[in-house]
């Protein structure tokens, strides 16, 4: 019999219940007990949703981040929070969110002067994790309480529980040695803690534990590869059986290593590594199970079940009961339930599957394998009909878009003159001071903004009323910026629910869900648009709002656009053509908008590419191909303007030392980047690479409620000036201010502007 299991389930709830519970608690509007009760309710519901599986994951739920939870389980707390003796959950929030000392209050979630932990992307996804912190003296001590509590909850509900933990090698690989020490030297200290944790699982009656080692799909150097055998030799004596899980890519040169580790089962991503399955099946021990991830855990398209069965049936004949099937990775990256969607176009809806529907697909495959296709004949027929409907749909294919793609040539990506000539013209046109100040684009999404948008979408407010409400917010944002003394202003993006969804809603080839939310970090959720067909722009998308904002001020107003690479990487993308083709289609659409903004008199245009690095393949050997079409797409979008028009781009969480040459090839006049959480370490890239254009290193972390100190901003900019000539530096936050409150934004920007004025005095 084929065994079914899941690697992880979305934790936010079908209607973002976790998000709202967290934010209510952080505001002091609910108790810790109430927050924990919401968590327990979500876990119970999600286990019930997975009751049809042979094994359900336990420990995949986290109030903020699973890597942060693993740090606490291993007793690896940053030094700055070790003196806190309150509830562990509040301490985790201290690490995740930070807190400025003068922002402290008596609420239990208050964090008292604590810097937020560094946050970065989880492999090549749009999920963020809190980076574990190490140094030479790091010690580990087990705290299994969170996992044991969830196991007891699951057992009380009758769940066949499979605890999920991050493996020791991946955990060290994900972290950062603050003193530059060798992280691998910590492995001997870490392994006894893992062994003790496995013994706790045995004592709880656990049969299988899932240990995630996704680092095995990356290009590891010899030292990291060599760490696996002693690590798993040290854990092999435990009585609980271990399923080693890899996902997000192919094993390649690590395949033989993975197959030889002393574990009881191996999971591989059969979406990205299908060609390796036969080799893995031949190499794993005859006593080991092989779990194949046959349902795509990172996209929203229905699985072609007939094709999947045709591939699985021979494998099942070979492996028999040793075959397990699962999604390719945790369903954390998938929306929860397609059945919540009431407004989706019926045809397009028939092509989709969210997390719960993916589990339906999984159990249907198992039924067909265990009992024969005849028992699910009707379901297979319906699936085949949906697959063919999508393949042949005229809504997917647009001849005019394909013709425009065919006409692309190198000239579309070229500015008239090189940066030095452009910079001189832009300086004359904009007349900005030294260390010019700006923000990244968005300002707080207030309750009034959200209410107006909700009423407009519900038909309770007509467009005239909605437009008036948005113009009121834009006017406020402009006035606040003028009062603060910022140099290049933004309109604040009041009209935008999300930096990708906003554009997708206005592009042909996209469709939108109501409840297709996925977690980005903490309480931050995003609702990626669904790119289902060829992309085109029917009409201007932003010009009206930017022109209104520009009319409110004599200062330069930035046009704000999301770049083609980021729109692509933050969408659920069609899987019937190369991503590069979809990206070029997006580039042509954004190019049209850029030219319309310039025609309307906008002289500073920002094209955000926050997710450029996120799209990098996990293997460096595959980077060049991606970077070539990603940079080309940006240049197509940006480079049709006159020399006097200044093009900005923004990148967040982008450790870009290793792609700095490609970023320079984008040829944006100004790039703004996230550097505050890493204390300007990202600027190390400029020690060895002469970046030719202007740069704005983010001087404070907008993901934390901390208010930046003026002197600290000055110090950060002085560090930046050691690498970048002062005349090419901008002063800005590290990201948009959408998630902050005005009460936090105004003092933060006030200190930032004051710091810039201090810096000008020294020029």
Curated annotation (Swiss-Prot):
SUPFAM superfamilies attached to this UniProt entry: UROD/MetE-like (SSF51726)
Cofactor requirement: Zn(2+)
Disulfide links within the chain: none
Residues binding 5-methyltetrahydropteroyltri-L-glutamate: 16-19, 121, 524-525, 570, 614
One example GO MF annotation: 5-methyltetrahydropteroyltriglutamate-homocysteine S-methyltransferase activity
Chain residues that bind L-methionine: 440-442, 493, 608
Protein residues bound to L-homocysteine: 440-442, 493, 608
The EC number(s) this enzyme carries: 2.1.1.14
Pathway noted in the entry: Amino-acid biosynthesis; L-methionine biosynthesis via de novo pathway; L-methionine from L-homocysteine (MetE route): step 1/1
Catalysed reaction, written as an equation: 5-methyltetrahydropteroyltri-L-glutamate + L-homocysteine = tetrahydropteroyltri-L-glutamate + L-methionine
Keywords: Amino-acid biosynthesis, Metal-binding, Methionine biosynthesis, Methyltransferase, Repeat, Transferase, Zinc
Top-level EC class: transferase
GO annotation terms (biological process): methionine biosynthetic process; methylation
Cofactor binding note: Binds 1 zinc ion per subunit.
Pfam family, one: Meth_synt_1
Origin: domain of life: Bacteria
Catalytic-site annotation from UniProt: 703
List of residues binding Zn(2+): 650, 652, 674, 735
Role summary: Catalyzes the transfer of a methyl group from 5-methyltetrahydrofolate to homocysteine resulting in methionine formation.
Protein name, per record: 5-methyltetrahydropteroyltriglutamate--homocysteine methyltransferase
Organism: Paraburkholderia phymatum (strain DSM 17167 / CIP 108236 / LMG 21445 / STM815)
